[in-house]
Amino acid sequence: MANIRKTHPLLKIINGAFIDLPTPSNISVWWNFGSLLGLCLVTQILTGLFLAMHYTADISTAFSSVAHICRDVNYGWLIRNIHANGASFFFICLYLHVARGMYYGSYLQKETWNIGVILLLLTMMTAFVGYVLPWGQMSFWGATVITNLLSAFPYIGDTLVQWIWGGFSVDNATLTRFFAFHFLLPFVIAGASMIHLLFLHQTGSNNPTGLNSDADKVTFHPYFSYKDLLGFILMLVGLTSVALFSPNLLGDPDNFTPANPLVTPPHIKPEWYFLFAYAILRSIPNKLGGVLALLFSILVLMLVPMLHTSKQRGNTFRPLSQILFWALVADMLVLTWIGGQPVEHPFVLIGQAASTVYFALFLIALPLTGLLENKALNWN
């Protein structure tokens, strides 16, 4: 008799995705981040659910309800710290996952890649509306500044902003709808992740060589289920260590002050994982131009498959492209640093230079290097 996991209508889907899935035998630790992102999402949904049981989405009580969670709810401080720092770990895994896709040419699986970019945008939206919920100073002013950017759109801008605010400023209506979005979006992300996996399993995983690995596949379980488990343990140890030893390391001290529309913080800045995009936004002295650059800084990822000029898939055997890839990583670190600095000389100039380099690498340098490497190998 056939095994139930291969015949049961539901179990055979799980079996095909997580147990008997044919997997390239040589995928490295860089392929762990997909499952780590799944773990992050589950952690965030569970901790978020328990926080939502005690949180009140009203401007008069939101800040106090978060304080109440940390002081009076059993292990509320731990749930909140895991949720807040879990977001940081989520984005670390996201950026590493995207970087892996860029380095090894995984973006040539276009459907998987494009759903991945949409997932990145959804996660960024979720994190943004979530940051507003504690209703501290940086929550309020971050919401005001970022939503205000939509007013840059010609003709409909002002109407659009007031529609999102639910009034003439960031107020109670804004907070309640942001809570609704923050509750809903993670489930949308979970659904989109399933589509992401569905597309991935149509083609199978890429591998570090970029070559076809059909001749050398192994079952996902036990080989990679245990390899993923090691990643799970390492990440959970890291997350709990941060949550227990330095929970406010990555937060902004301004958010310990309740929101006050009459007092603007000296430096309005988002959480660290948005600083690179914030630096690109600020480096353009025109409002609409800045907003478009901000959008394009993420959407440029959708152009990467179309700009692939090399006859090889990954960067494994392409030293020039490797140099450019690491230049892009360094550039993003520079942008992250600049995003957290005040708008004054020399930071403005460095930000503009780094933003130019960011787009030049994506749109000009990487495609040209691919052509150059083809020429060097007489593959043109």
UniProtKB/Swiss-Prot annotation:
Keyword Mitochondrion in annotation: yes
One of the Pfam families matching this protein, by short name: Cytochrome_B
Cofactor(s) it depends on: heme b
GO annotations of cellular component type: mitochondrial inner membrane; respiratory chain complex III
Main location: mitochondrion
Cofactor note: Binds 2 heme b groups non-covalently.
Compartments, record wording: Mitochondrion inner membrane
InterPro entries xref list: Cyt_b/b6_C, Cyt_b/b6_C_sf, Cyt_b/b6_N, Cytb/b6-like_sf, Cytochrome_b, Cytochrome_b_C_euk/bac, Cytochrome_b_N_euk/bac, Di-haem_cyt_TM
Keyword presence, Protease: no
UniProt protein name: Cytochrome b
Organism encoding this protein: Acipenser persicus
